[in-house]
Curated annotation (Swiss-Prot):
GO MF assignments: translation release factor activity, codon specific
Major site of localization recorded for this protein: cytoplasm
Family: Belongs to the prokaryotic/mitochondrial release factor family.
Source organism of this protein record: Shewanella sp. (strain MR-4)
PANTHER family listed in its UniProt record: LD18447P (PTHR43804:SF7)
Name of the protein: Peptide chain release factor 1
Gene: prfA
SUPFAM superfamilies: Release factor
Protein's UniProt keywords contain Cytoplasm: yes
């Protein structure tokens, strides 16, 4: 392992011991905010520190085995050769593991996520498939013990949604779901198709991270145009008697957000503002990412909604993930929320890209 990497790991080990000592300090325990921040830092350091300690142990084992080679006993030397081989294999495995653990983390990976699903080409069939994707993400959220809340929805005439925005709350939600952004294409025979012909429809998915209040970008109220109107969604007669629905336009960017799923105008406004903040932040993030990644590809789809990332072929029971040339004949399982079969390989490829970029930077 490179000396610079060893030095970095030694620094993290030292910091881990410092944080552990601070967590036992009475003044830190009394300051709940600082205690929480240090607890989080300790948990983030734990895995890499454990890996480095295992690496140090494997190095020590290798040195001990090399010393055994000096023994006169042939059996002992043979045993030493086996131990050297095992220690080298363990060092190689731990080095690869530590390289991944040291990769720069996306600070937003642990935040909640907004998923915006919008029907594209394909009319009613696209809206129905948007509903299918919503159900898929709902099942995936359930499997991860995340909470899901509908922020805004516009139902299709024959089922599904023309557009739906949901908030997914839970640890690591954005970190996993961010790979879902892009164009999702479906190929299947619609129920209304009497000739049995396969139709192709498209749905776009945009995943944005929630912006914590403390980090929220400043939005000038003078830049907002706020309209109220009567909700057209479900919710009983009360909804239609009051102008509880909210439409907020951010004039500088032209971003428009509508929320009408809550009975209270105040709640709809709060939800609309949180989605608006996420959308504006997403635009800023994309500008920064474009500048940083102009020299390398990114598996996290850009704001270009036309970028096709996945195809769902129902007649063949096939899912094709175009970014990594992955084909699975497990369509039913994926539609039932088994997304890790796709997201796992995507994350591995993403890590490989980051490692390659890091190697290029280090020359």
């Amino acid at each position: 392992m490179k000396e610079s990497v060893i030095r970095k790991l030694e620094g993290l080990l030292e910091r881990n011991e410092e944080v552990l000592a601070l967590l036992g300090d009475a003044s830190v325990i009394a300051d709940q905010e600082r205690f929480r921040a240090l607890s989080k830092e300790y948990s983030q350091l734990e895995e890499v520190v454990a890996g480095f300690k295992a690496y140090q142990q494997a190095l020590a084992d290798l040195e001990s085995a090399k010393e055994m080679l000096e023994e006169d006993d042939a059996e002992m030397r043979e045993m030493a050769q086996e131990e050297i081989k095992a220690a080298k294999a363990e060092l190689e495995r731990l080095e690869a593991e530590l390289q991944i653990l040291l990769l720069p983390k996306d600070p937003n990976d642990d935040t909640n996520a907004f998923i915006e699903i919008r029907a594209g080409a394909g009319g009613d069939e696209a809206a129905i498939f948007a509903g299918d994707l919503f159900r898929m993400y709902s099942r995936y959220a359930e499997a991860n013990r995340w909470q899901l809340e509908i922020m805004s929805s516009n139902e299709g005439e024959h089922g599904g949604f023309k557009e739906i925005i949901v908030k997914v709350s839970g640890e690591g939600a954005y970190g996993k779901l961010k790979f879902e952004s892009g164009g999702h294409r479906v190929q299947r025979v619609p129920e209304t198709e009497s000739q049995g012909r396969v139709h192709t429809s498209a749905v776009t998915v945009v995943v944005m991270h929630e912006v914590p209040e403390a980090e929220a970008i400043s939005i000038n109220p003078a830049d907002l145009k706020v309209d109220t109107f009567r909700s057209s969604g479900a919710g009983g007669q009360h909804v239609n008697k009051t102008d509880s629905a909210i439409r907020i336009t951010h004039i500088p960017t032209g971003i428009v957000v509508e929320c009408q799923d809550q009975r209270s105008q105040h709640k709809n406004r709060a939800q609309a503002m949180s989605v608006l903040a996420a959308r504006i932040q997403a635009v800023e993030d994309e500008k920064r990412r474009s500048a940083e990644e102009s020299t390398r590809r990114s598996l996290v789809a850009s704001g270009d909604r036309s970028e096709r990332v996945r195809t769902y072929n129902f007649p063949q029971g096939r899912v094709s993930e175009h970014r990594i040339n992955l084909t699975l004949y497990r369509l039913n399982e994926v539609m039932e929320g088994d997304l890790d079969a796709i997201l796992g390989p995507l994350m591995q490829e993403h890590q490989a890209d980051l490692l390659a970029a890091l190697a290029d930077e280090q020359g």
